[in-house]
């Protein structure tokens, strides 16, 4: 049975368009028998902002404060969750041309030297290999393949850095450019999901 980790990152709750698409995707895979874990980074599973104390603690060590120990344990949980699943689905709405801070927090918690990547004499090497990732990205405007899209290139870079290079992308564009454009963007995205999950 396939195991899927879904990361929601919208802060819009019931108004989230990325959540609508993620739920559409999840229903397909659930019907196919996949085991799905959902982490709502913009809602009930929001993570603490990584500050200097937390970042230092994530490097480990013998003399960690109670807060650092707690955050290191949280990071270990998130990394184990990432490694335990075959497919990682990331809901990535575009906020001011980039990803939500809540999703960036998750990245900061799981991107750890010696744990999800390592450095060699020839550069970095990802340690989370053999996985598939699906990015579901929603935007108010039209940014696909253009210089204003800092969502997909960034996430592909992060995923490749930790070893995940099999990445598929579902775009929902122009969602704030009028009712017709919204409906067209959502319809095309759902069609892409239908093909991806068939």
Swiss-Prot record:
This is FMN-dependent NADH:quinone oxidoreductase. It catalyses: 2 a quinone + NADH + H(+) = 2 a 1,4-benzosemiquinone + NAD(+); N,N-dimethyl-1,4-phenylenediamine + anthranilate + 2 NAD(+) = 2-(4-dimethylaminophenyl)diazenylbenzoate + 2 NADH + 2 H(+). Quinone reductase that provides resistance to thiol-specific stress caused by electrophilic quinones. Also exhibits azoreductase activity. Catalyzes the reductive cleavage of the azo bond in aromatic azo compounds to the corresponding amines. SUPFAM superfamilies: Flavoproteins. Its EC number is 1.6.5.-, 1.7.1.17. Its cofactor is FMN. One of its GO terms (molecular function) is oxidoreductase activity, acting on NAD(P)H, quinone or similar compound as acceptor. The gene is azoR. It holds the Pfam family Flavodoxin_2. Keywords: Flavoprotein, FMN, NAD, Oxidoreductase. It comes from Shewanella sp. (strain W3-18-1). Belongs to the azoreductase type 1 family. Homodimer. FMN binds at residues 10, 16-18, 94-97, 138-141. Binds 1 FMN per subunit. The keyword Oxidoreductase applies. It is an enzyme of class 1 (oxidoreductase). It comes from the Bacteria. Disulfide bonds: none annotated.
């Amino acid at each position: 049975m396939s195991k899927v980790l879904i990361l929601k990152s919208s802060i819009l709750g019931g108004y989230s368009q990325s959540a609508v698409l993620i739920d559409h995707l999840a229903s397909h895979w659930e019907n196919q028998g996949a085991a799905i874990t959902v982490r709502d980074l913009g809602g009930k599973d929001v993570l603490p902002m990584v500050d200097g104390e937390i970042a230092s603690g994530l490097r480990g060590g013998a003399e960690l404060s109670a807060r650092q120990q707690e955050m290191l344990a949280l990071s270990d949980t998130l990394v184990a969750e990432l490694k335990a699943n075959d497919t990682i689905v990331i809901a990535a709405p575009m906020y001011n041309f980039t990803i939500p801070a809540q999703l960036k927090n998750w990245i900061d918690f799981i991107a750890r030297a010696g744990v999800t990547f390592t450095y060699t004499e020839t550069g970095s090497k990802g340690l989370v290999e053999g996985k598939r990732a699906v990015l579901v990205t929603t935007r108010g405007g039209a940014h696909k393949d253009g210089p204003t899209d800092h969502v997909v290139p960034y996430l592909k870079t992060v995923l490749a850095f930790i070893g995940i290079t099999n990445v598929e992308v579902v775009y929902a564009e122009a969602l704030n450019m009028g009712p017709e454009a919204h409906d067209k963007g959502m319809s095309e995205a759902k069609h892409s999901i239908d093909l991806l999950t068939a």
